[in-house]
Amino acid sequence: MLYIYMHFPNPDTVTGNLIFQVLDKTVEMSSEQLHKLFTKHRSEFFTEIAALLKLNFIVIVDRYIWSGLAYAQADGITIETKDTFKPDYTFFLSSNKPLKEKPFNIQRLFEEKDKQEIIFNNFITIMNDVPKNKFCIIPAHLNKEIIYNIVLTKTLKVFDNNSCLKYIKMYDDKYLNVQDLNLIDFDWQKCIEDNNDKEEYDDNNFIV
């Protein structure tokens, strides 16, 4: 089993580095501009994720589309969701500990206590709309090794229960026909198909 771990924002890209500067408050940007930047940043990795899935990798992504939605909704902003994949399985680390607000001079953007509570509630609302067999809530206070084993066990179960990859479901309910994806010219746009009575895909690769 091969897997790749990604996280957003990624400081190794120009867009990701700019996002970190905004979060650290060294660069000013409106909320709408920032969320558009986050959306652009996720889209930048579309081809990489598609290629990895084509090559039978499991792709584990920290802070992907659900995070984008939860944070944008906290600012009352609707974001573009095309060119993102719908997670096949989601792990949500939840804590019942009171949020501790950092001193203002070292706070990053979004780290105010009130804002964090709104974002947390947004996550709960989003998770309520995710099918129960496609997500797992993990208490964040558990030992890291226990969390790792939970993630590994659940991931292997999903992996073992699925068969060969043909389509990757995208967030807007379109499908990427990964079977026809050519890794040489990689013109993935022509592989996007509408959901016209297409059966739910089965795959042995998934975004967590």
Curated annotation (Swiss-Prot):
Q: Which domain of life, per UniProt?
A: Viruses
Q: Which Gene3D superfamilies match?
A: P-loop containing nucleotide triphosphate hydrolases (3.40.50.300)
Q: Which GO terms describe its biological process?
A: dTDP biosynthetic process; dTTP biosynthetic process; dUDP biosynthetic process
| PROSITE patterns hit by this protein | THYMIDYLATE_KINASE
InterPro entries attached to this UniProt entry: P-loop_NTPase (IPR027417), Thymidylate_kin-like_dom (IPR039430)
Q: Which molecular function GO terms apply here?
A: dTMP kinase activity
Query: Which Pfam families does the annotation name?
Result: Thymidylate_kin (PF02223)
Role of this protein = Catalyzes the conversion of dTMP to dTDP.
Tell me the protein family, please.
Belongs to the thymidylate kinase family.
Q: What is the recorded name of this protein?
A: Truncated thymidylate kinase
Q: What is the lineage of its organism?
A: Viruses, Varidnaviria, Bamfordvirae, Nucleocytoviricota, Pokkesviricetes
Q: Which gene encodes it?
A: TMK
